[in-house]
Amino acid sequence: YVAISRYNLALYALSKVTDENYPLKGVRTGEVKFLRGATYFFMKTLWRYIPWVDEENGRTVEDVTNISNRPNGTDDTYLWEHIVADLEEAVRLLPEKQEEIGRINKNAARAMAAKALLFMAYKQDARHQVVEVDKKILERALVYINEITDQEGGNVGLCEDFAENFLPEYDNATKEAIWEIQYSINDGTSSGGNTNNGAELNAPSWEPYFPCCDFHKMSFNMANAFRTGT
């Protein structure tokens, strides 16, 4: 919600300027809508019922405190509708290409909107079992998917070698990547770079080189599955 607060502040600030005073208003609004929609998407898939706070209903601490994660006992459909609305607005506002590497473009928004719609289409009960598939929502997702795949051979396509997606020499250069988060290393900052902290936490504990955190531990079931007999 720290991230959500920042998006909401940005959207509120953007609403106070005109296109004449700030020609990039529409593009920047689309970028922030994408980020907010994507962040809420990941929150939604983790916790299902979450409070929806935006630039209109969450202006004060009191406002936020009064927001329920299930207004009037509703199901979670309204959350998907908000998430998809943000992402579809991003599709409308963003350009096909951005001048600066790492900025979100229309294809990134199309892909994220399609992903959210695919999740939304599969209705689940209280035990997270799929009980219904909404074909109309799947058709909405297919529109965005087709808009991307129709560019095959041009802006998008599969790499001859799948490994190219992960090798540094192909950074921001493969047609298979829809959008890439930008990381850096040894960039002159005090932290040593804008790195993926989550990935760093997976390294085995190895003082003094890796003091933390060895997260990639197998489960007991996995260990037992490969336990040798005596």
Regions found by a protein language model. Give the residues of each.
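An aromatic- and glycine-enriched ligand-binding surface/loop that stacks and positions planar moieties
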Residues: 1, 50, 80, 88-89, ...
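Short, flexible loop/turn elements at secondary-structure junctions
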Residues: 56-59, 98, 162, 183-185
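Flexible, glycine-rich phosphate/dinucleotide-binding loops
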Residues: 46, 61, 123
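Residue-level detector of alpha-helical recognition elements and their boundaries
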Residues: 22, 52, 58, 98, ...
